[in-house]
């Protein structure tokens, strides 16, 4: 039989599908710059639990925000991973709305690649970046990250990015979704 997870997606079709799913609760900002592998930034803002992504899980309460970046890289090396992790982190930090009432901000680079080097995968899974503001009175920032390797269908994440990884798996690979190509 054919490997079901095998290349059913190009990076472009995978990203298009993710953007379609994210657009229900994120504001999507397509990237302007063609030289840059970031294809879109998806912004999520929430005040005291107005958005519930699934009826079962209310993920965040109070003032929370997430900046999720979809990054299209054919072959992810450790060097590329570190370069774009740092770029996204710096870009995201500039966007945070920090102050009283702010609870948490997530900066979430999601790497969409055909293939990925093991050292890049390891670095991504170990990545931990967080910061608290004003001794946590003004909340905190956590760096979540996930990776989809389309040639194998493997999805990895750092500890903070697990819910992102679950969402990616559901959107890209759950059998229910196969019908609506």
List PLM regions with ranges.
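N-terminal, charge-rich interaction modules
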Residues: 5-73
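Catalytic micro-motifs at enzyme active sites that drive phosphoryl/nucleotidyl and oxygen chemistry
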Residues: 56, 95-99, 131-135
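Short, surface-exposed beta-edge/turn micro-motifs
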Residues: 64-67, 104-108, 143-144
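A broadly used, surface-exposed interaction patch
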Residues: 64-95
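"Short basic amphipathic alpha-helical interaction patches in structured regions
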Residues: 82-87, 121-128
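Nucleic-acid nuclease catalytic cores
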Residues: 99-125, 149
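Charged, structured surface patches that assemble and position nucleic-acid processing machinery
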Residues: 125-181
């Amino acid at each position: 039989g054919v490997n079901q997870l095998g290349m059913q997606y190009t990076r472009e079709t995978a990203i298009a599908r993710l953007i379609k799913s994210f657009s229900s609760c994120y504001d999507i900002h397509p990237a302007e710059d063609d030289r840059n592998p970031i294809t879109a930034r998806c912004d999520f803002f929430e005040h005291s639990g107005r958005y519930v992504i699934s009826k079962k899980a209310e993920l965040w309460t109070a003032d929370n925000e997430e900046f999720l970046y979809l990054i299209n890289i054919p072959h992810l090396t450790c060097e590329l991973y570190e370069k774009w992790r740092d770029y996204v982190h710096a870009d995201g930090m500039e966007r945070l709305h920090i102050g009283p009432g702010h609870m948490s901000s997530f900066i979430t680079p999601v790497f969409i690649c055909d293939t990925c080097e093991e050292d890049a995968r390891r670095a991504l899974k170990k990545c931990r970046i967080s910061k608290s503001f004003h001794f946590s009175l003004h909340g905190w920032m956590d760096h979540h990250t996930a990776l989809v390797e389309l040639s194998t269908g493997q999805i990895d994440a750092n500890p903070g990015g697990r819910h992102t990884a679950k969402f990616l798996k559901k959107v890209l690979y759950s059998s229910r979704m196969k019908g609506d190509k």
